Amino acid sequence: MAKEELLEMRGRVVELLPNAMFRVQLENDHEILGHTAGKMRKNRIRVLVGDEVLVELTPYDLTKGRITYRFK
């Protein structure tokens, strides 16, 4: 999939789930399941409840996404 096809949205982590998954509430009040991107895992960036994050969504499945950035 080309990178241009991904949708980027901001959201807030509302729940930590097993297997490094997170429930994220997007700006438009939709809730999705998100997992951390590989570079975030590699650099050991922690994501906690209440953190503001940037999520990449694919147009094929808008219920799951990849957390690519944690805002400070």
From Swiss-Prot:
GO function terms (MF aspect): ribosome binding; rRNA binding; translation initiation factor activity
InterPro entries: NA-bd_OB-fold (IPR012340), RNA-binding_domain_S1_IF1 (IPR006196), S1_domain (IPR003029), TIF_IF1 (IPR004368)
Major localization class: cytoplasm
Taxonomy, superkingdom: Bacteria
Keyword Cytoplasm: yes
Keyword RNA-binding among record annotations: yes
NCBIfam families (alphabetical): infA
Subunit structure: Component of the 30S ribosomal translation pre-initiation complex which assembles on the 30S ribosome in the order IF-2 and IF-3, IF-1 and N-formylmethionyl-tRNA(fMet); mRNA recruitment can occur at any time during PIC assembly.
Functional summary from the UniProt entry: One of the essential components for the initiation of protein synthesis. Stabilizes the binding of IF-2 and IF-3 on the 30S subunit to which N-formylmethionyl-tRNA(fMet) subsequently binds. Helps modulate mRNA selection, yielding the 30S pre-initiation complex (PIC). Upon addition of the 50S ribosomal subunit IF-1, IF-2 and IF-3 are released leaving the mature 70S translation initiation complex.
The protein's name in its UniProt record: Translation initiation factor IF-1
Species for this entry: Zymomonas mobilis subsp. mobilis (strain ATCC 31821 / ZM4 / CP4)
Organism taxonomic ancestry: Bacteria, Pseudomonadati, Pseudomonadota, Alphaproteobacteria, Sphingomonadales
Name of the coding gene: infA
